[in-house]
A protein has these predicted regions:
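Short, small-residue-biased leader/transition segments that mark boundaries at the very start
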Residues: 1-8
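Conserved acidic residues
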Residues: 5, 59, 166
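A short, glycine/Asx- and small/polar-enriched loop/turn
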Residues: 10-15, 162-166
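C-terminal edge-of-domain segments
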Residues: 11-20, 236
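Conserved S-adenosyl-L-methionine
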Residues: 41-160, 176-177, 183
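C-terminal catalytic and target-recognition region of SAM-dependent MTase-like enzymes
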Residues: 155-259
Length: 260
């Protein structure tokens, strides 16, 4: 039944417009994140930033500052084609006279049929805080993608991987508190050193730290200004080379074998 609390009247210049709240909680709340870290991204912003990159589900993705796991979880949901909001309820579900219950059931069933939960992906999330890593695992479990993500306690200075053409997509500390700002030069230097050791990887990073490029040691290929809530941030994009096409890769493999 439609409640009066779902209706929002707006009076503007003697004209009244009545709007209906169909969602309840804000749409950026997917329903899986009960545990959060100090400075979490909204789920919607994390998903949008991932889609701004050329990452595809056949490429490895690592977040070395995973916090509550938002980037890895959203990436896994994109890869598995899990519709946003599958883990939450909407106010309009209770509107018996406006939206038939069967329509909700049919819509959810259709979304479930399109899911590919058995997909093989390599998505990893690291954080230096063991409790935060534990929270990320719990959030991933609620989202139904815990089997698709490897979470581990690890410092960014220890970031390395043998795979090529991977993606680092991350939200490192901004240093919003004065005492944290003193640690940022060393932290971003470590990010730059770790990235330099990754063969042919791309780095995508959202931060409000304006000296990020200076301490990373190179200028970003692209830089987008984005507001994370009320905080002006920058989405730095350090682009690695594209992987060779399958035919080219096969030819190079044959050449190497012939030379042996």
């Amino acid at each position: 039944t439609l409640s009066l609390h779902d209706a929002l009247p707006i009076l503007l210049k003697d004209e009244v417009m009545v709007t209906l709240d169909t969602s309840g909680d804000s749409l950026h709340k997917r329903g899986y994140r009960l545990m959060t870290s100090k400075a979490p991204l909204t789920e919607t912003l994390a998903a949008a930033l991932i889609m701004l990159t050329p990452w595809k589900k056949d490429r490895i993705l690592v977040d070395p500052f995973c916090g509550s796991g938002t980037f890895p979880i959203e990436a896994a949901m994109i890869a598995a084609n899990i519709a946003p909001g599958m883990n939450r309820q909407f106010t309009a579900e209770q509107w018996k006279n406006l939206i038939p219950k069967q329509l909700w059931y049919d819509t959810v069933e259709e979304a479930q049929d399109l899911m590919d939960a058995d997909i093989q992906v390599d998505i990893q999330g690291y954080d230096i805080d063991a409790e935060v890593v534990k929270a990320a695992r719990e959030n991933a479990k609620r989202a139904g993608v815990d089997h698709l993500i490897h979470f581990q306690q690890r410092a960014v200075a220890d970031l390395h991987h043998p795979k090529k053409y991977g993606f680092v997509i991350t939200n490192p500390p901004y240093g919003e508190r004065l005492e944290e700002k003193e640690d940022l030069p060393e932290l971003y230097t470590q990010i730059g050193q770790a990235y330099a050791g990754l063969d042919s990887w791309s780095l995508y990073m959202i931060t409000s730290y304006e000296d990020a490029e200076r301490y990373i040691g190179r200028k970003a290929d692209k830089n987008r200004k984005i507001y994370n809530g009320m905080i002006k941030t920058y989405f730095y994009q350090f682009m690695g080379p594209k992987p060779p096409k399958r035919r080219e890769a096969a030819e190079k493999t044959i050449e190497r074998k012939e030379q042996q």
